[in-house]
Amino acid sequence: MEANMQENIREGEDKRKGRSFYRKKVCRFCAQKVKIDYKEPDALRRFITERGKILPRRITGTCAKHQRKLAVEIKRARAVALLPFVMNE
C-alpha cells in the first residue's frame, strides 16, 4: 500500500516539473504590424469564444495596448451587427 502511494507521489512530482516549460506568447498585432479593424469580423472571431465572450490576453497572447483596442473593435463590430452579442448554443 505504501509503495503504491510512493509511486503516485513521484508521478505527481514529475507532472509538476514538466509544467514549468511554456512558450512565450507574442502579440500578433505587434509582430506582424496588423491593424485591428471592426470591419473584419473573421479576424475578430479568433479572439472571442464560441459563446461570444472576448478572450482574455493571457489566453490570446496579445499585449495590453492591443487587447484594449481589440475589445473596443469587437464591441464596435457587435454594435453594427457584424458580430453577434451572444452565440446560439
Curated annotation (Swiss-Prot):
Which branch of life, at top level? Answer: Bacteria
UniProt cross-references to InterPro entries, sorted A to Z: Ribosomal_bS18 (IPR001648), Ribosomal_bS18_CS (IPR018275), Ribosomal_bS18_sf (IPR036870)
User: Membrane-spanning regions, if any?
Assistant: none
A Pfam family it matches: Ribosomal_S18
What are the recorded Gene Ontology BP terms?
Answer: translation
- A GO CC term attached to the entry: cytosolic small ribosomal subunit
What SUPFAM superfamilies does the annotation carry? Ribosomal protein S18
Main role? Binds as a heterodimer with protein bS6 to the central domain of the 16S rRNA, where it helps stabilize the platform of the 30S subunit.
- Assembly information from the UniProt record: Part of the 30S ribosomal subunit. Forms a tight heterodimer with protein bS6.
Q: What is this protein called?
A: Small ribosomal subunit protein bS18
Q: Which organism is it from?
A: Treponema denticola (strain ATCC 35405 / DSM 14222 / CIP 103919 / JCM 8153 / KCTC 15104)
The primary gene name is: rpsR
